[in-house]
């Protein structure tokens, strides 16, 4: 059972759609060394990650992201979320982004 993920390699991808969606055993994901500026879709990225408790996305470059639909929807255990440096100027869809995030 996966409980923790540490991202240390930066791949050349543009979409993170449903990347961790449905991973209901993960408690934390470390993006400490992650920086990418060509991502355009983060929809459903953490959808239904019901055991995820902390998430630091302060290193994310979101300048080109246009879709954050349901990004954190269903993350009902999320207690700590760092979105410092998040740029949402180009985002066209943030609907349901924080649906069922209670904390």
PLM region descriptions:
Residues 3-11, 25-38, 50-66, 77-90, ...:
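Structural signature of tandem-repeat unit edges
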């Amino acid at each position: 059972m996966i409980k923790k993920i540490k991202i240390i390699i930066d791949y050349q991808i543009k979409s993170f759609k449903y990347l961790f969606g449905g991973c209901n055993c993960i408690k934390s994901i470390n993006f400490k060394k992650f920086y990418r500026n060509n991502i355009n879709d983060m929809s459903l990225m953490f959808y239904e990650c019901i055991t995820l408790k902390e998430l630091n996305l302060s290193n994310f470059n979101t300048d080109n992201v246009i879709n954050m639909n349901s990004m954190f929807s269903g993350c009902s255990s999320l207690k700590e979320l760092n979105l410092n440096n998040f740029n949402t100027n180009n985002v066209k869809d943030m609907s349901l982004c924080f649906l069922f995030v209670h904390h």
